[in-house]
């Protein structure tokens, strides 16, 4: 699934950052038992959907620039930069290092660490805001 994994991750990022996309459609990318580990916090599938909704409430725009991606079998890893613009106009850039596991053609796990490159203290919570 290596080539497909890269395409799949890029499609997920596109849907995740397109705020006109129905948030519930993101479930199609993830397994029912999905888990996301973000800076020591654990999110379930429902938590992830709540997270996506919260981002759409707090942000005007979100862009993700994939800097590196490696895929092998049912595993993948990315280094990407999330550029968030709040409704107030403030912006932040967050570096994300993420590991992915796939099961049954969907993502079952994302384990990620984030680092705020530009922004304030509140931006540290953007990776798991509810």
UniProtKB/Swiss-Prot annotation:
SUPFAM superfamilies in the record: NTF2-like
GO MF assignments = cyclase activity
Pfam families per the UniProt record, alphabetical: SnoaL_2
Q: Name one GO cellular component term.
A: cytosol
* Entry-linked InterPro entries: NTF2-like_dom_sf, SnoaL-like
What is the protein named? Uncharacterized protein C11D3.04c
């Amino acid at each position: 699934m290596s080539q497909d994994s890269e395409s799949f991750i890029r499609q997920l990022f596109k849907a995740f950052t397109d705020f006109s996309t129905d948030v519930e459609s993101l479930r199609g990318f993830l397994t029912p038992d999905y888990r996301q580990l973000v800076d020591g916090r654990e999110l379930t599938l429902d938590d992830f959907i709540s997270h996506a909704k919260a981002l759409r409430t707090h942000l005007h725009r979100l862009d993700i620039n994939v800097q590196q991606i490696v895929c092998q079998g049912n595993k993948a890893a990315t280094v990407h930069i999330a550029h968030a613009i709040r409704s107030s106009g403030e912006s932040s850039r967050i570096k994300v290092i993420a590991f992915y596991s796939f099961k049954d053609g969907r993502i079952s796990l994302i384990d990620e660490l984030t680092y705020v490159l530009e922004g304030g203290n509140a931006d540290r919570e953007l990776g798991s805001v509810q």
